[in-house]
Amino acid sequence: MRRWLRLLVGLGCCWVTLAHAGNPYEDDDYYYYREDEPRQHGEPNYVAPPARQFRFPPLNNVSSYQASCVVKDGVLDAVWRVQGTFYPEKGIVARVGWSGRRGRKWGRLHAPECLVETTEAVFRLRQWVPTDLDHLTLHLVPCTKCKPMWCQPRYHIRYFSYGNSVDNLRRLHYEYRHLELGVVIAICMAMVLLLGYVLARTVYRVSSAYYLRWHACVPQKCEKSLC
């Protein structure tokens, strides 16, 4: 019993720690801000500030990238600048994917315009985007000589629909995610406890029946043995 209590207390502490961990992207440039322009057709415009230069381990000759994004009247204007080593004569494959509603919806946008040099590649995309857009991902393979592994310079727009504010987005992306995690942990714990209860009850019944059958002194059994 003490072990179960310790386990429950430990899981509760972990959940509280995750819930109060805060927003890991608080100081990140991923967050967009709202323009001080008048709304058109009742829909606000969104502009994503230029992303900082992100670095990650070399993969398919890509070293770093920068990204910027503007969503205005439902039209996306995005630019990716990817630094690395490229072979323009061999060509390059680039696709832009999107997802929304916390991963429940996804799709692919048009192929971006590519300007490839030996040390830098620029990808531009201008297209209408869904209103429940969550984030964009630029998938690219720098050259055909490289192994067929996808490089994914990501740029998160963090933008669900025109009516949501930044506070609502943070709540949807983080607080609600922690709440979902807590609910999942609680359901798993309840299932484990229920399974343990059923198993313990089954073992108790089987052992009781075995004991009564072979070891307990039942009146009929005792009378027969005395005869």
Swiss-Prot record:
<dbReference type="GO" id="GO:0044167">
    <property type="term" value="C:host cell endoplasmic reticulum membrane"/>
</dbReference>
<dbReference type="GO" id="GO:0052031">
    <property type="term" value="P:symbiont-mediated perturbation of host defense response"/>
</dbReference>
<feature type="disulfide bond">
    <location>
        <begin position="69"/>
        <end position="151"/>
    </location>
</feature>
<keyword id="KW-1015">Disulfide bond</keyword>
<feature type="topological domain" description="Lumenal">
    <location>
        <begin position="22"/>
        <end position="178"/>
    </location>
</feature>
<keyword id="KW-1040">Host Golgi apparatus</keyword>
<keyword id="KW-0393">Immunoglobulin domain</keyword>
<feature type="glycosylation site" description="N-linked (GlcNAc...) asparagine; by host">
    <location>
        <position position="61"/>
    </location>
</feature>
<feature type="signal peptide">
    <location>
        <begin position="1"/>
        <end position="21"/>
    </location>
</feature>
<comment type="similarity">
    <text>Belongs to the cytomegalovirus US6 family.</text>
</comment>
<keyword id="KW-1043">Host membrane</keyword>
<keyword id="KW-1038">Host endoplasmic reticulum</keyword>
<protein>
    <recommendedName>
        <fullName>Unique short US8 glycoprotein</fullName>
    </recommendedName>
</protein>
<dbReference type="GO" id="GO:0044178">
    <property type="term" value="C:host cell Golgi membrane"/>
</dbReference>
<keyword id="KW-0325">Glycoprotein</keyword>
<feature type="topological domain" description="Cytoplasmic">
    <location>
        <begin position="200"/>
        <end position="227"/>
    </location>
</feature>
<feature type="transmembrane region" description="Helical">
    <location>
        <begin position="179"/>
        <end position="199"/>
    </location>
</feature>
<keyword id="KW-0732">Signal</keyword>
<feature type="domain" description="Ig-like H-type">
    <location>
        <begin position="61"/>
        <end position="155"/>
    </location>
</feature>
<dbReference type="GO" id="GO:0016020">
    <property type="term" value="C:membrane"/>
</dbReference>
<dbReference type="InterPro" id="IPR012536">
    <property type="entry name" value="CMV_US"/>
</dbReference>
<keyword id="KW-0812">Transmembrane</keyword>
<keyword id="KW-1133">Transmembrane helix</keyword>
<dbReference type="Pfam" id="PF08001">
    <property type="entry name" value="CMV_US"/>
</dbReference>
<keyword id="KW-0472">Membrane</keyword>
